[in-house]
């Protein structure tokens, strides 16, 4: 791949290299062994567990909160099976509609108040009332009641196959009800603060610079070795790399292939590649603008050089997708063909579009350094067909706001599951009740698909669920709802001083800071 270095980036790198290395070397000596330094390209958008569906936010929220259940760690590896965290035991009725959870005594929020059944009810009622993305993981008619101070009951109106697993995801965080008593209200307060019972709490956030987390002195679990976690916001990947090399950072995220190649040659740096269910795809706005025409969507999908993206931009470190459900997730359909470029078909589909398609916009952010070259690849393919693609780069928070409103033609994003069920890829992507940032980012609506995916979610027979999801996949592929680009391993470079990191494919960008040591 030919690397393009922007003048301002080159200048910054030269200035950093010339002036900053000595400062970083001296700074690294001052970084305490009990402090973990993480480098990210962008601030969180919100820290409210009832609102965020962005793994970038979860680096802060996941360790700050606890949930009724959590993912097991087996032989040092993350598992998709769950075990009790705040819950000691649970029971379910024979029909799968009633679930009761007994809480462990002694858990406290970071202000010292008790974690009890009222707090659990408050948290889930709030999620369902706000109706943001996290609520899509739960049945919309679910009710939560307090049986006694340490017992909580969930009642569903229909069986819900992934229910127990959903209780481990970020949106199931148990929030201190005291958050509602802050003058600005719970929504405003929780967007920039934490109020949980996890091992760490947020103590400072200087936007665009750092987020600082310190131990929660009331945490009832094993005392962490780390005293502090500092997240540094550093937009330039080259600067994140240099700071990792020189000891000012312990972990860095979202690194392009050229920076990973440079890091691979440095002693003291370990690059972890973990099998992942994360997918990258193009959102095609099916509700308005030029992408509301299915022939126009097909032309965009057919114009893209998928192989060039994987081999050129990603250095071969990804595999093609053949539909919504990635390899490694049950209900994956190996009989489907991966997407591929076909300019002749694209030209024929464009000829069917009226009025003629001449201009499109491509919305992306600085969250992932690969997104811009992917956009340029799409631009080249469309240009050969007489379509002009305008590149529109936004701050990540601004882009997500636009996605939520459906204010775009074509946009790019990545998605990884929060629990081990195809629901994450089928119901979130296509259910008409979840349009926008919640998951259905192509704003798609098809009653036949709604029926299939909703039936699958309420069916306990796994074979039947596979059949229903695979039927739905064929329909949405024919409707050209998304362009499925690739499935890529989760790559995280870190200092070899960091010990005990546990990767879980349900928790990308979440670091087990309660058990990591240096």
Predicted feature locations:
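Ligand-site clamp/hinge motif
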Residues: 216-262, 388
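Long beta-strand-rich cores associated with HINT superfamily self-processing modules
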Residues: 492-518
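Gly/Pro-rich hinge or "lid" segments in bacterial periplasmic/extracellular proteins
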Residues: 69-77, 168-224, 228, 344, ...
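Surface-exposed binding/hinge segments that line
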Residues: 8, 102, 136-180, 204
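Alpha-helical secondary-structure segments
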Residues: 37, 116-123, 149-155, 198-199, ...
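Extracytoplasmic/peripheral linker and loop segments enriched in polar/acidic and small residues
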Residues: 295, 384, 388-399, 404, ...
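N-terminal lobe/hinge region of extracytoplasmic solute-binding protein
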Residues: 40-94, 125, 195-196
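Append "and occasionally in soluble cytosolic enzymes with long acidic Gly/Pro-rich linkers
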Residues: 215-217, 265, 292-380, 384-385, ...
